[in-house]
A protein has these predicted regions:
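Catalytic-site neighborhood detector that most strongly recognizes the C-terminal catalytic loop/helix
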Residues: 115, 169, 283-308
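DNA breakage-rejoining catalytic core of tyrosine-based enzymes
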Residues: 50, 93-95, 107-123, 172-183, ...
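Short, polar N-cap/turn motifs at the start of nucleic acid-interacting alpha helices
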Residues: 157-160, 268-295, 317-324
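C-terminal catalytic core of Y-nucleophile DNA break-rejoin enzymes
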Residues: 170-190, 203-237, 249-251
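Basic, Lys/Arg- and aromatic-enriched nucleic-acid-binding interface segment
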Residues: 109, 118-147, 172-174, 275
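N-terminal core-binding DNA-recognition domain of tyrosine recombinases/integrases
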Residues: 1, 14-28, 34-112, 245
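C-terminal secondary-structure termini that scaffold catalytic or DNA-interacting sites
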Residues: 1-6, 308-329
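Short, basic (Lys/Arg/His-rich) helix/loop patches that form interaction surfaces
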Residues: 178, 201, 232-281
Length: 329
């Protein structure tokens, strides 16, 4: 039996966030949950949970579509679906009640991600305004890191002698000791020399690529104990300096996807077995299908093109020197 007075959406949202935190859900997931609930409250008002019906949710998702992309609306849809499942467990709504019942997810059109080809990587790095910005670009291109992963790195995570760098993958909760390529090694050594010149003796707990602080009019210094808050701004500015005009949707994923696709093409061209799975591991994706979409390719098509382009489809026929003679009765 349902209580006579169920909580308002704002109160339920706070209670839900505490529960999700106790269950070990990532901060990013919980932020998405709360964003979806704020959208719902703005649309419907701070009504009681059991007053949410099909029409209210339909209108809320429609309003989200006015300012959000189809994929973002679908993400909010999924977040709200999880919230109302929790509401059923809490008996805030009936066990058989689902205000999202019958509301379809939006179709998301395929969008080609713009990528930087490998031969342009040096030019992009040179376009960085400062050594600090250059190091952020290098982490995206050569380590395929997400923003949260790149800005969280500390000096203690880097071991140039063993050629490894430890990365916390917040999306999965894993800690991966990743290999440092020769390209990344060069950038790290260059950056660490500059870092030491600017900040003095380096401390293991300092951020690998820290925030900056104002020390005068349009003058800045490194702030080793502070984390960069908006790494995407660094990427946007560097891309603009590199010659890209539209950088609105660009961020670390532009670098991550570019580096990953370039490496896959390199491995695939050299017929390395399991090229896609190798790149999948480096991207920390849960499935090959996710990696295929991220790289903008279908491996079977790539193999087909490589095997057939400019080559004979039936080489066995060309190898035969015998010309068949058709006999007539």
């Amino acid at each position: 039996m349902l209580p006579c007075m169920t909580p308002k959406l704002s109160d339920a949202a706070r209670e839900y966030d505490v529960w999700r935190d106790m269950q070990g859900f990532a901060k990013a997931t919980r932020r998405n949950d709360q964003s979806a609930l704020r959208h719902l409250i703005r649309s419907a008002g701070d009504i009681r949970v059991n007053d949410c019906d099909h029409n209210i949710l339909t209108q809320a998702l429609h309003k989200m579509g006015e300012t959000c992309s189809a994929s973002s609306v679908n993400m909010h849809h999924a977040s709200l679906s999880a919230f109302f499942r929790w509401c059923r467990i809490q008996k805030y709504i009936a066990p058989d009640e689902d205000p999202l019942m019958g509301i379809r997810y939006k179709k998301v059109g395929k969008r080609d991600r713009r990528r930087i080809p490998a031969h342009q990587f040096p030019g992009l790095l040179d376009a960085a305004k400062t050594p600090r910005e250059r190091m952020i670009i290098a982490l995206g291109l050569y380590l395929f890191l997400r923003s949260s992963e790149a800005v969280s790195l500390r000096l203690r995570d880097v071991d140039l002698q063993s050629g490894t760098i430890g990365v916390t993958i917040y999306k999965t909760g894993d800690y991966d000791v990743m290999p440092i390529s020769s390209e990344l090694d060069k950038e790290l050594r260059r950056w660490l020399l500059h870092y030491q010149e600017q900040a003095g003796e380096l401390h293991p707990d300092w951020f690998l690529v820290p925030a900056k602080k104002s020390v005068g009019f349009q003058e800045f210094a490194l702030n080793p104990t502070a984390r960069i808050s908006r790494p995407e701004d660094i990427v946007k500015e560097t891309l603009r300096r590199f010659g890209w005009e539209d950088t609105y949707w660009q961020g670390m994923h532009a670098l991550r996807a570019s580096g990953a696709r370039a490496w896959f093409d390199e491995l695939d061209a050299n017929t390395v077995d399991g090229a896609l799975r190798i790149v999948q591991t480096h991207l920390h994706h849960s499935s090959v299908t996710m990696t295929e979409r991220y790289l903008g390719l279908t491996v079977d098509r790539a193999k087909r093109d490589r095997l057939l382009k400019g080559e004979a489809m039936f080489p066995s026929l060309q190898a035969s020197n015998v010309t068949p003679i058709n006999r007539t009765a």
